[in-house]
From Swiss-Prot:
Disulphide bond pairs: none
UniProt-listed PROSITE patterns: YCGL (PS51648)
Protein name (record): YcgL domain-containing protein Csal_1462
Database matches in InterPro entries: YcgL-like_sf, YcgL_dom
Domain YcgL: 4-88
Annotated PANTHER family: PROTEIN YCGL (PTHR38109:SF1)
Pfam short name (any one): YcgL
């Protein structure tokens, strides 16, 4: 079973966007383009991650594999529900 001490950061630019990195390596190996879009990482927590650890929106095995391969795992925000997007597209003229 693979286990890794991970540090999790949230993005100040987008709600519900998180960056998982190896605690030992930190942010030193992050691509500049990623950090530019992500913003200044805000530390959230440190977590001992193993393949059987349940996560809310990702499989722990996928997170561990991505950290091993590229040094990080980027968790994107969930897709917005289409009915919520329609509220912004609907014309508002004549409603008030």
């Amino acid at each position: 079973m693979t286990r890794r001490l991970c540090e999790i950061f949230k993005s100040p630019r987008r709600d519900e966007m998180y960056l998982y990195v190896d605690r030992a390596r930190g942010l030193a190996d992050m691509p500049e383009a990623l950090l530019e879009r992500f913003g200044k990482p805000v530390p959230v927590t440190v977590l001992m991650l193993s393949e059987d650890k349940p996560l809310a929106r990702a499989k722990a095995s996928d997170v561990l594999a991505a950290i091993e391969a590229q040094g990080f795992y980027l968790q994107m925000p969930p897709a917005r529900e289409s009915y919520l997007l329609d509220l912004y597209r609907a014309p508002t003229e004549g409603r008030y």
